[in-house]
Amino acid sequence: MLRFLFLLFVSFSGMAASESDLWEKIKQASLASQNLCYSGILNTVDEKQDISSTRMIHVNHKNEEFLKIEKIDGAPNLLLMHQTDAVLYDNDHDKILIKRKKNARLFPNIFPTSVEKLKENYSIFDGGPFRVANRPSTMFVLSPKDQYRFNYHLWLDDESSLPLKLMVIDNNQKIIENISFANLEFLSNEDVSWFRPNLDPQKKYIINEENQLSQSVRKFWSIEQLPQGFEEMSYSAKRYSGLNAIAHQIVFTDGLSFISVFIHPVPKNQKPQTGSTRMGSNNIHAQYKQGYQIMAVGAVPMTTLSSLTDNVKLSNE
């Protein structure tokens, strides 16, 4: 608790710098995370205070981003990312599942293209000097202007503006996300020869391709009112294998926070999920309407999720 009071105190004590100057620092951080070449060890602390470590390397080669993240602890999972398209190699005993994901955004590249949208939903404060990964840094606090999102604490490298640490703090002053560089090295060249998986001939590789459907799939639902500051980022639909049923996923964002809404039919012999729970850094809220499961997931307050599921209207309602 004393730590949080201290963070709160330094957040407001650093207000001498103008707000426009502070937002300019965030712009510089966004550019640094995309344009610089760097590598290092990232530590992630979960809600049980367990630490998991990954090794990452990021290179901007001819204005294109290449990223590789390898797990150091546990199964040697691997993520390769080109621009915003990611491929995950997930070790599963005697086989490796290959999963694809579009529009991925991973630390330290966590900012939207324009920070103008962030200004609408967050106030910004200077949290003062710190030291992260043995480098001088400055903490910035992004505090929500309403009840629909959480607090973000960011530590930016003084020399390069690269984000070195991120903490997401909920309304109960609990840290729900905590990731930081343990060490950091800036690279002097744009070599991308490392951008490939190390294939294991002893294992079977399975591409987990979901049967994605086109945007022309008829939407039988609508969301009448979004929480303040959120807008649709992406939409996808897939058909269940062997079933004449379609599952929908819509992703919403305010620039920092993300919410996924899943809408899918519930078989007659299956009990739908309803109510609220928490899994890791994400809150989950589920409702059941007219034979369909509606579930919202995100690192945002539960009221934000419930406002979304409440406003999903099916065409037969």
What residue ranges belong to the model's regions?
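An acidic-aromatic
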Residues: 56-109, 168-180
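Gly/Pro-enriched, hydrophobic low-complexity segments
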Residues: 133-201
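Short, hydrophobic/aromatic-rich segments at coil-to-beta transitions
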Residues: 35-39, 62-68, 134-141, 162-165, ...
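Short, solvent-exposed recognition patches
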Residues: 204-289, 303
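A short, surface-exposed beta-strand/turn
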Residues: 60-61, 80, 153-165, 266-270
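Sec-dependent signal peptide recognition
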Residues: 1-7
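N-terminal leader/targeting segments and the immediate start of mature chains
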Residues: 8, 12-64, 101, 129, ...
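Intrinsically disordered, low-complexity linker/loop segments enriched in Gly/Pro
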Residues: 103-152
